């Protein structure tokens, strides 16, 4: 499976990992807020 534009593929991968990182930070923030305000 040869990609016509491997650079674009890496950019999409970085964007996906960025979204996963933001989602992880959001979940951790919710868990910590529930822990501190409970």
Swiss-Prot record:
<comment type="function">
    <text>One of the components of the core complex of photosystem II (PSII). PSII is a light-driven water:plastoquinone oxidoreductase that uses light energy to abstract electrons from H(2)O, generating O(2) and a proton gradient subsequently used for ATP formation. It consists of a core antenna complex that captures photons, and an electron transfer chain that converts photonic excitation into a charge separation. This subunit is found at the monomer-monomer interface and is required for correct PSII assembly and/or dimerization.</text>
</comment>
<protein>
    <recommendedName>
        <fullName>Photosystem II reaction center protein L</fullName>
    </recommendedName>
</protein>
<comment type="subunit">
    <text>PSII is composed of 1 copy each of membrane proteins PsbA, PsbB, PsbC, PsbD, PsbE, PsbF, PsbH, PsbI, PsbJ, PsbK, PsbL, PsbM, PsbT, PsbX, PsbY, PsbZ, Psb30/Ycf12, at least 3 peripheral proteins of the oxygen-evolving complex and a large number of cofactors. It forms dimeric complexes.</text>
</comment>
<keyword id="KW-0934">Plastid</keyword>
<comment type="similarity">
    <text>Belongs to the PsbL family.</text>
</comment>
<keyword id="KW-0793">Thylakoid</keyword>
<dbReference type="GO" id="GO:0009539">
    <property type="term" value="C:photosystem II reaction center"/>
</dbReference>
<dbReference type="Pfam" id="PF02419">
    <property type="entry name" value="PsbL"/>
</dbReference>
<keyword id="KW-1133">Transmembrane helix</keyword>
<keyword id="KW-0472">Membrane</keyword>
<dbReference type="GO" id="GO:0009535">
    <property type="term" value="C:chloroplast thylakoid membrane"/>
</dbReference>
<dbReference type="InterPro" id="IPR003372">
    <property type="entry name" value="PSII_PsbL"/>
</dbReference>
<keyword id="KW-0674">Reaction center</keyword>
<dbReference type="GO" id="GO:0015979">
    <property type="term" value="P:photosynthesis"/>
</dbReference>
<keyword id="KW-0812">Transmembrane</keyword>
<keyword id="KW-0602">Photosynthesis</keyword>
<feature type="transmembrane region" description="Helical">
    <location>
        <begin position="17"/>
        <end position="37"/>
    </location>
</feature>
<keyword id="KW-0150">Chloroplast</keyword>
<dbReference type="InterPro" id="IPR037266">
    <property type="entry name" value="PSII_PsbL_sf"/>
</dbReference>
<keyword id="KW-0604">Photosystem II</keyword>
